[in-house]
Amino acid sequence: MILSPRRTVALGVATVLAGVGIASAAGSPSLSAEALSGYLSSHAGSAKAATGTPKVPAATPKADCGPGSHPEGAVQGRVPLADYATGRAVKGYTCNSGAVGHIGSTGGFKTFRYTDRTGRVCAFYDGTLLFPTSLAHDNEAPGVHVLDMSDPARPVQTARLVTPAMDSPHESLALNPLRGLLAAGMGSPATAPGVVDIYDVSQDCRHPVLQSTTPLGILGHESGFSPDGRTLWISTTAGPGVTAIDVSNPVLPSIVWHSFNYTFHGMNLNADGTRLYGADLGSSPGLTILDVSQVQKRDANPVVTQISHLTWPEVSIPQNTIPVTIKGHKYLVEFDEYSKGTSTSPSSAVGAARMINIDNEKKPFVTGNMRLQVNQPAARATDESKDPGAAYPVQGYAAHYCGVPRTVDPTIVACSFIVSGLRVFNIADPYHPREVAYFNMPAPNTLPLKSGAYAMSAPSFDVKNHSVWYADGDSGFWNVRLMNGAWPKGL
C-alpha cells in the first residue's frame, strides 16, 4: 500500500525563517570551506588521501565463533575478492548468529522496532540510500518501509511511506516510542529542503497516519527526538544549521529555536532532554556537548551554550552518538562514518566507533574503541581495495551506525560496518570492548553498483527473542538472532 502521494511543498525557507529568532549563542565554529568540501567530496568520491600513516587504536579483539558459525577468513571484517570467485561469499559469514527472517533487497540508514498500544510489533526502515541516484541501484521502490513483525520469521510489508521527507529521509528517520511518532526531514543531495513529515504510529503501527508535512527543517540530513517526544531536532551538513521543532501537537509543529552556529551530523539527547550530544563536523570534527535546557523548558528566546568539545586522532566523519549508563557511569557510544580521505588508502584513517566517558561533561574522554582488523592501515596497504565494494567511495571497509538494546547497562552494541556487515560488541567493560558476533551477507553483483555488503543502518533490538534487526542497502531487511552466549545473560 502506498500512503499519501508525493507532492510538492511550495513554502520556501524564507517563509520558514520569517518571524523566527535566529540564535547567536556561542558554540563550535562554523563548518569551514575545507571541512565542507572534504565531507561532500567523501560522499561524492573525490576526497584526497592523507599522507603518512595515521595513528589509530588497535583493532577490537575478534569474536570466538561457536557451533553453527560460518566465520570469515584470517582478517577480521574482510570479504576478499577470491571468496566471490569460489562462491564462498554468496553463502555469507556468520559468527554466533543466524538469520531468522528476511525481506526486500535494499535498505537505508535507520531501522526501528516498535510496539503500538494494541501490542502489535512493527519494523520501520528507510529504503533510499541516496535519492534519486539510488533509483538505478535499487530494484525496489524508495520510501520508508513498514513491516508487520507479528511473526519475526516472516516479515510482511503493510505500507510504504512516500511523502516528501519519507521518500528521501537520508539519515533523518526518527522514532519516538513514548508518543508513537515517526518523523523525518528530507535530506541530500546536499542536502535538500528540510521538509519534515510526522506520522502517528501509536494506534496501528502497520498503517501510519500522516499528521503534517511542513518545511520547518529548513535544510535536512539527520535528526534526533527528545526522549519525551516533544522536540524534534533537525540538522544539516550543507553548512551550519540546527533546528529545534516543537511537535507537542504533531499536526501543527513549530520552530522553537534555530542556530547557524553549529554544524552537526547526527545528535542525541540525555534522558531529560537538557543535553544534546552532537556529532560535530566543524573545523574540529568530533563531539560537542550542548546545554539545551532552555529549549526543552520552552523558555522565551532560549539560549543554548556549549559545555565541551572533544576530538580524537583517527576522527573521520562523526556520525552520531548514543548516551548510555554502564555500572552507574555515563558514557556515549560515538561512531564515525567512512574514512578520513579515500576509501582504501592506508594513509586515510577509518574513524570506526568508540566509548566516551561523560561523567564530567566538561571533560569527556575516550575509554575504548570498536574497530576491525580490516580498518587498520596495515590491512588497507594490502590488496583489499580489490574486494567488491571496498573502493566504492560511499561504501568501503568502515563503520556507519550503532544501536543498543537499552540505555542502562546495555552490555552489547550492534554496529553496521558497511562491507563488513553487522558487528556486535560487548561493552560491559567500556575500557575494553570485545567483538562477540557478526553477520554479513554480501550481495551478488546483479544490478548496477550492487556488489558486496552495504550495511549502513542503525540496528534495533528484539530483546525477547535475542535478535538484532538491521537493513543492508544491497540485500534488504534482516532479523538476526545471536547465539552461543553472544546475547548477554540478564538482558
Predicted features and spans:
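Feature marking well-ordered beta-strand scaffolds used for ligand recognition
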Residues: 29-491
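Secretory targeting and sorting signals
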Residues: 2-28
